[in-house]
Curated annotation (Swiss-Prot):
Name of the gene encoding the protein in the UniProt record: leuS
Gene Ontology annotations of biological process type: leucyl-tRNA aminoacylation
Lineage, broadest ranks: Bacteria, Pseudomonadati, Pseudomonadota, Betaproteobacteria, Burkholderiales
UniProt keyword terms in alphabetical order: Aminoacyl-tRNA synthetase, ATP-binding, Cytoplasm, Ligase, Nucleotide-binding, Protein biosynthesis
InterPro entries, alphabetized: aa-tRNA-synth_I_CS, aa-tRNA-synth_Ia, Leu-tRNA-ligase, Leu_tRNA-synth_edit, M/V/L/I-tRNA-synth_anticd-bd, Methionyl/Leucyl_tRNA_Synth, Rossmann-like_a/b/a_fold, tRNAsynth_Ia_anticodon-bd
Motif 'KMSKS' region per record, residues: 624-628
UniProt-recorded Gene Ontology molecular function terms: aminoacyl-tRNA deacylase activity; ATP binding; leucine-tRNA ligase activity
Annotated ATP binding sites: 627
Organism of provenance: Burkholderia orbicola (strain MC0-3)
Protein name: Leucine--tRNA ligase
Family: Belongs to the class-I aminoacyl-tRNA synthetase family.
EC number: 6.1.1.4
Record-linked NCBIfam families: leuS_bact (TIGR00396)
Disulfide-linked positions: none
């Protein structure tokens, strides 16, 4: 055993032992309770960042703790390897996305292995491998058979210069990110999955999940079950009587309608624009906007009057129709009723275009003004109808019922439940993704690829250049034979949304070599007992994976309907930011390692200079580590300098897993210093610790009893904290243990060995390398087996018992000392001991006790 703790040597030795023993290869075992814990699989972007380190360490700690407690634990890993970033990198570097992706996987896998993670690498998957995405294609075809997958036209962002479809994030201020061209909206045929068919189940099943309430609420809002009224405004056009249909949750405000707004793609807009150039121009302008709901929410609200009116269904009054850029054809009916008096967006629109605003809702104690929007205008909880004729005086629910009844009686509409959730469009006009298994035949139309011909393999040697989908130019991929008639045909060149890849990978981990999509092993491991990932995945990934799981269940592939029982959303890793701003307002960000910070006498930062030139930089505050702010910390540099265990210890100690973690160089140094102390104690007491002397607990001296009492008391709390995933306080407990052991005077070697062994096991899940080596070197492995499967220490309840207890001694309510009495001392004995104590004689001024108050187990107060 070396005197000095050398992390590189210790970690290499431990990892060598684990590799030799194939320590993390896991099989099904019906004799043990199982625990399946999964970290969301990473995108192979090139290098791990500190967010990865934190996520995987949390998973690893959980795995090791539960394995020591007798669970059959599994921690797999894979790669979410398809996607647009690989295409962008390929264009920038002139290499196929496949090469860039596989090179990154190799490097990042090496980084994970250097962290000592308990990953069963025999289960590794990469979503870009044909043996994985074959099953994306297979299930897609099953969904097609069942009517869950279907084809319809959808709106996309089209770059007219690059002649390609753009993702929403590639549209910047209405222009293509590469070409700078004004983006157009286009309708193209796309495949969709009927996630709306599962809307009720997706909503209701949230109740049974051990997920953060915040995530559940986000999903509830995204699914968006709404109770309202669907009705129409009648109009006549081209000799036909029609209805302009809208849906509203605020039918109580129907008497406040002063206009209707329709989407640019609405059939009525197209018809009204036929002979009106100004309408056509506005419709074309709307088509240049983004297609994402978020884009619409933030863009400037614009509209143009059509000069056409519909009739109010209850009053018969004319209602002017406008085309609005904020109305989406893909949501609701593509038309909305404008109630500017009680909808904030409509209020702003009406003020902008000088449209009438009517108050039809009142709230007790409030005064309505047209000057500015007030929150209560839209509050249905306090709403009472006014200026609404027969509905005056009705509250929200009563008014909705009454209005709905009248609309139904008039043949205009009725109550309806609607959903914000829309079917999942899975077609992507991109190269690096799962090919959609469809063949286009001139005679037979769209023909599914036969099951025996799966997978449709994506060519890995293409290099995108930004001018359209490379698959459409690849003759080898594109040209094929129709499986129905044998005629020449073309393959579908769209690929699947990469959220498909990540919707079921956790099930494939359980049976990675199966010749079917999943097998019986999947029902052993799934659902996941714990899923770990960032809050940014709360909606799309987590919702899609829930849907995909339910489809697999309904197809008879699995027996469960939810992918994860419990979810932990770990907090972001934050760091300081520093920048300079040029005359044009452009900021250049500097890495904290390249900056020297000065502090005031209270340790607060007051200034900073760049090391390269000694000139000032601006303190930008603490923000999430990111490339854009250049405030990331390279985990590899940290591991190279301090070792993986220090990196792990700091990330677990600095904050509870679900909270944000602020990076601290001093904190990292403190973590390293603590591990050196753990090693140093083991080295300095190696002979005593290695001796396997037994002891009789009943005959131990006071020093031994006190040490054991402290260690087992702290162990009890540490065990509780492990179970509730509060790993920061687990580390605090280990620090208390080391202080107690290191400071124990007169403790015997046998008790030191026992208590140090407890410390090593408590620390092991967090810092497995150093504890594993100390355990082996000091002979614990010979007695209990390797630390990997050593039993979790049991609390010795007898050691916690105390013959004496200490009570606070007060005189006239002021603390004057402490009083030691037998644990089972009577009240009379406690009172006698109190008045006989030196403190009473000193602070009573010779006066006798008038009254003695005893609070059992806590204090004695003598009143004189």
């Amino acid at each position: 055993m070396h005197e000095r703790y050398v992390p590189a040597d210790v970690e290499a030795a431990a990892q060598g032992d684990w590799r030799a023993a194939d320590a993390y290869k896991t099989k099904e075992d019906s004799q043990k309770p199982k625990f399946y814990c999964v970290s969301m699989l990473p995108y192979p972007s090139g290098k791990l960042h500190m967010g990865h380190v934190r996520n995987y360490t949390i998973n690893d700690v959980m795995y090791r703790y539960l394995r020591m407690n007798g669970y059959n634990t599994l921690m797999p890993m894979g790669w979410d390897a398809f996607g647009m970033p690989a295409e962008n990198a390929a264009m920038a570097n002139g290499v196929p996305p496949a090469k860039w992706t596989y090179d990154n996987i190799d490097y990042m896998k090496g980084q994970m292995q250097s962290m000592g993670l308990a990953i069963d690498w025999s289960r590794e998957i990469a979503t870009c491998k044909p043996d994985y995405y074959k099953w994306n294609q297979w299930l897609f075809l099953k969904m097609l058979e069942k009517g869950i997958a279907y084809k319809k036209t959808g709106t996309v962002n089209w770059d007219p210069v690059d002649q390609t479809v753009l993702a929403n994030e590639q549209v910047i201020d209405g222009r293509g990110w590469r070409s700078g061209a004004l983006v157009e909206k286009r309708e193209i045929p796309m495949y969709y999955l009927r996630i709306t068919q599962y809307a009720d189940e997706l909503l209701n099943d949230l109740d049974g999940l051990g997920w953060p309430e915040r995530v559940k609420i986000m999903q509830q809002n995204w699914i968006g079950k709404s109770f309202g009224v669907n009705f129409g405004f009648p109009y006549e056009l081209d000799g036909e009587q029609k209805l302009l249909r809208v849906f509203t949750t605020r039918a109580d405000t129907i008497m406040g309608v002063t206009f209707c707004a329709i989407a640019a793609e609405h059939p009525l807009a197209t018809r009204l624009a036929q002979d009106k150039p100004e309408l056509l121009a506005f419709i074309e302008e709307c088509k240049r906007g983004g297609v994402a709901e978020a884009d619409v929410a933030t863009m400037e609200k614009k509209g143009v009057a059509t000069g056409f009116s519909v009739k109010h269904p209850l009053t018969g009054e004319p209602v002017e129709v406008w085309i609005g850029n904020y109305v989406l054809m893909s949501y609701g009916e593509g038309a909305v009723m404008g109630v500017p008096g009680h909808d904030e967006r409509d209020f702003a629109f009406a003020k902008k275009y000088d449209l009438p605003i009517r108050q039809v809702i009142a709230s007790e104690g409030q005064t309505y003004s047209l000057d500015a929007w007030q929150e209560w205008y839209g509050d249905k909880e306090t709403a009472v109808c006014v200026n609404s004729g027969k509905y005056d005086g009705l509250r929200y629910a009563e008014a909705v019922d009454a209005v709905a009844a009248d609309l139904k009686a008039g043949g205009f509409g009725d109550k309806q439940v609607t959903w914000r959730l829309r079917d999942w469009g899975v077609s992507r006009q991109r190269y690096w993704g799962t090919p959609i298994p469809i063949i286009h035949c001139p005679s037979c139309g769209d023909v599914p690829v036969p099951e025996q011909d799966l997978p449709v393999v994506l060519p890995e040697d293409l290099v995108p250049d930004g001018s359209g989908n490379p698959l459409a130019k690849s003759e080898a991929f594109l040209n094929c034979t129709c499986p129905k008639c044998g005629a020449a045909a073309k393959r579908e060149t769209d690929t699947m949304d990469t959220f498909v890849d990540s919707s079921w990978y956790f099930s494939r981990y359980t049976a990675p070599d199966a010749e079917t999509m999943v097998d019986a092993r999947t029902d052993y491991w799934m659902p996941m007992d714990q899923y770990i990932g960032g809050i940014e995945h709360a909606i799309l990934h987590l919702l899609y994976s829930r849907f995909w799981t339910k489809v697999m269940r309904d197809l008879g592939l699995v027996k469960f309907g939810e992918p994860a029982k419990n979810l932990l959303t770990q907090g972001m890793v934050l760091n300081e930011t520093y920048y300079r701003e040029d005359a044009a307002g452009k900021k250049t960000w500097y890495n904290p390692l390249d900056v020297t910070v000065t502090h005031d006498d209270k340790g607060r930062p007051v200034g900073a200079t760049l090391n390269a030139d000694g000139q000032p930089v601006v303190l930008g505050g603490i923000e999430k580590m990111s490339k854009s702010k250049n405030n990331g910390v390279d985990p590899q540099l940290l591991i190279d300098q301090y070792g993986a265990d220090t990196a792990r210890l700091f990330t677990m100690f600095a904050a509870p897993p679900e909270q944000q973690l602020e990076w601290s160089g001093a904190g990292v140094e403190g973590a390293s210093r603590f591990l050196r102390r753990v090693w140093s104690f083991g080295y300095g007491n190696r002979e005593a610790l290695a001796a396997r002397a037994g002891f009789d607990a009943a005959t131990l001296g006071d020093a031994d009893k006190a040490l054991r009492r402290e260690i087992y008391s702290v162990l009890k709390q540490a065990d509780f904290d492990y179970q509730r995933l509060q790993y920061n306080t687990v580390v605090s407990a280990a620090m208390k243990m080391l202080n107690a052991i290191d400071g124990a005077k007169g403790a015997t070697p046998a008790v030191l060995r026992e208590t140090y062994g407890v410390l090593l096991r408590v620390l092991y899940p967090v810092v497995p390398h150093v504890t594993f080596e100390l355990w082996k070197t000091l002979g614990y492995a010979d007695e209990f087996g390797p630390l990997l499967d050593a039993p979790w220490p049991k609390v010795d309840e007898a050691a916690l018992e105390q013959a004496e207890i200490e009570l606070v001694l007060q005189v006239n309510g002021k603390v004057r000392g402490a009083l030691k009495v037998a644990k089972d001392a009577s009240r009379d004995a406690i009172e006698a001991a109190a008045v006989a104590d030196e403190a009473f004689a000193k602070f009573s001024d010779g006066k006798p006790a008038k009254k003695i108050v005893v609070v059992p187990g806590r204090l004695v107060n003598i009143v004189v």
